[in-house]
A protein has these predicted regions:
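Short, positively charged and aromatic/hydrophobic N-terminal segments
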Residues: 9, 13-16, 20-22, 27, ...
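N-terminal Rossmann-like NAD(P) cofactor-binding subdomain of oxidoreductases
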Residues: 55-260
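Oxyanion-binding "anion nests"
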Residues: 264-275
Length: 275
């Protein structure tokens, strides 16, 4: 047992000596030392890291970064190797540190929250995400903005092609109907090629995503009668946003479930249009 422990200790020392940091021209690079050949070669990790530094990053701006959807979007983009977030937009927390709103971002995000000036933002980034209530993105969008950036909207403003259907279900006037024909429904499993060249992407809703991905393959092959579909889906209360509502309080929803929007949910036309 004693010899085994000594051998393990020796192996650890050898491993520690194999990986050494060498400072080259002020840059830290990870090298693997080959003592038999008495030469140094870059590891796969060091090469990948250097390539990432030299790669042109996609600059992203988020309007509505402090909502639940916006917060999750920040988390996902922070882990994307090709994306750099340049703008954390929030009407409610202007000039406050983003990490003060989401404390899990302390020492990760040092930026302060900015306003929702989409025109100013379009001059600074490559893509704009709008994680905002229905009607907001459509009210700000114009041709000048779209000539500079791509826009990915997380609301329903560009999910439905028919303006009248949108206004009937969402009870608001659509402010940019001229852009509806070119908007692409952002479900990459179905519209991958169209998404690549789109200026406007409509991020799918929660119920439509789970419903369409389940049904589309069967519908495409004609294996089901579309008139017999019944969608029984469940959603967490985070989907209702951060706004304070009695129906969403902990004591109301804990260990509970309730039906809502039965046969009248506003995601219905979105699902019907895509299928």
């Amino acid at each position: 047992m004693h010899n085994t422990q000594k051998n393990i200790h020796k192996r650890r020392i050898i491993i520690q000596k194999i990986c050494v940091f060498i400072l080259v021209k002020g840059k830290k690079r990870l090298y693997t030392k080959d003592y038999k050949q008495n030469s140094s070669i870059p590891t796969e990790h060091s090469i990948e890291r250097k390539q990432r530094i030299e790669r042109i990053m996609i600059k992203a701006g988020i309007i509505g970064a402090t909502g639940y959807a916006g917060g999750e979007l920040v988390r996902i983009l922070m882990g994307h190797k090709d994306v750099e977030i340049k703008w954390y937009g929030s009407r409610s927390y202007i000039d406050q540190k983003y990490a003060a709103v989401y404390q899990n971002m302390v020492q990760i995000v040092e930026d302060v929250c900015k306003d929702d000036n989409m025109e100013e933002l379009a001059d600074q980034v490559d893509v704009i995400f709008t994680a905002t209530p229905q009607g907001f993105c459509a009210s700000l969008l114009n041709e000048d903005i779209l000539s500079k950036v791509k826009v990915i909207d997380l609301s329903a403003d560009f999910r439905i092609k028919d303006q009248n259907v949108y206004e009937e279900w969402y009870k608001i006037e659509h402010k940019s109907p001229q852009f509806l024909p070119e908007a692409v429904y952002g479900l990459c499993e179905i519209n991958r090629e169209q998404i690549k060249g789109a200026r406007i992407l409509a991020n799918p809703g929660c119920y439509p995503t789970c419903s369409i991905l389940s049904i589309y393959p069967l519908a495409k092959e004609g294996l089901i009668d579309m008139n017999t579909l019944i969608i029984d889906a469940k959603s967490g209360t985070s989907g209702a946003g951060r706004g304070a509502k009695v129906d969403n309080l902990y004591c109301e929803v804990n260990e509970n479930i309730k039906a809502y929007g039965v046969a009248s949910h506003r995601h219905t036309p979105e699902i019907e249009e895509q299928l």
